Curated annotation (Swiss-Prot):
<dbReference type="InterPro" id="IPR016543">
    <property type="entry name" value="Fis1"/>
</dbReference>
<keyword id="KW-1133">Transmembrane helix</keyword>
<comment type="function">
    <text>Has a role in mitochondrial fission. Has a role in outer membrane fission but not matrix separation.</text>
</comment>
<comment type="similarity">
    <text>Belongs to the FIS1 family.</text>
</comment>
<feature type="topological domain" description="Mitochondrial intermembrane">
    <location>
        <begin position="147"/>
        <end position="153"/>
    </location>
</feature>
<keyword id="KW-1000">Mitochondrion outer membrane</keyword>
<dbReference type="GO" id="GO:0000266">
    <property type="term" value="P:mitochondrial fission"/>
</dbReference>
<dbReference type="InterPro" id="IPR028061">
    <property type="entry name" value="Fis1_TPR_C"/>
</dbReference>
<dbReference type="InterPro" id="IPR028058">
    <property type="entry name" value="Fis1_TPR_N"/>
</dbReference>
<dbReference type="GO" id="GO:0005741">
    <property type="term" value="C:mitochondrial outer membrane"/>
</dbReference>
<dbReference type="GO" id="GO:0005778">
    <property type="term" value="C:peroxisomal membrane"/>
</dbReference>
<protein>
    <recommendedName>
        <fullName>Mitochondrial fission 1 protein</fullName>
    </recommendedName>
</protein>
<feature type="transmembrane region" description="Helical">
    <location>
        <begin position="126"/>
        <end position="146"/>
    </location>
</feature>
<dbReference type="GO" id="GO:0000422">
    <property type="term" value="P:autophagy of mitochondrion"/>
</dbReference>
<keyword id="KW-0812">Transmembrane</keyword>
<keyword id="KW-0496">Mitochondrion</keyword>
<dbReference type="InterPro" id="IPR011990">
    <property type="entry name" value="TPR-like_helical_dom_sf"/>
</dbReference>
């Protein structure tokens, strides 16, 4: 079992198509009796992908491993956090990451990911406020224009 977790940046570096095809072929070859390590390797390759559908499948496979393989839960927590972070599911990413940090408060990779999640949530929250403010200003301008035109008639 892997004890050292990758940093979040590694999730942003997709495998090349031939590498992902090797993992998929192994996964497909094992069929219904797919091994946990094979499934995990394929799931991680999918999470690293730039394709949203691949990332979603990777998260589903990791969720399956988490449910059926207690010995892999530590790893799965982190990889599920990374996968959900890449998908923009920041609440889920934080939930999985916090479960890992509860068990391992000194885990540098999980701490780093927590900072990335918090930064992304803060940035998107500010963007949301800016968008709502812009919509409010636009509505005010349109309302004032309509009111002004109504008074002229």
């Amino acid at each position: 079992m892997v004890t050292e977790l990758p940093y979040a940046l590694d999730a942003e570096t997709p495998l090349n198509p031939s590498e992902l095809n090797v993992l998929k072929a192994q996964y497909d070859r094992e069929g219904e009796m797919v091994g946990v390590q094979t499934k995990f390797n394929y799931a991680w390759g999918l999470v690293k992908s730039n394709q949203r559908n691949d990332q979603q499948l990777g998260v589903r496979l990791l969720s399956d491993i988490f449910r059926v393989s207690p010995e892999r839960r530590r790893e799965c927590l982190y990889y599920l956090a990374l996968g959900n972070y890449k998908l923009g599911n920041y609440g889920e990413a934080r939930r999985y990451n916090d479960l890992l940090l509860d068990k391992e408060p000194a885990n540098l990779q999980a701490s780093n990911l927590r900072s990335l999640i918090d930064d992304k949530v803060a940035r998107e929250g500010l963007m949301g406020v800016a968008i709502l403010s812009g919509v409010g200003v636009a509505a005010g301008v349109v309302g004032a224009f309509l009111l002004r035109n109504a008074r002229k008639r």
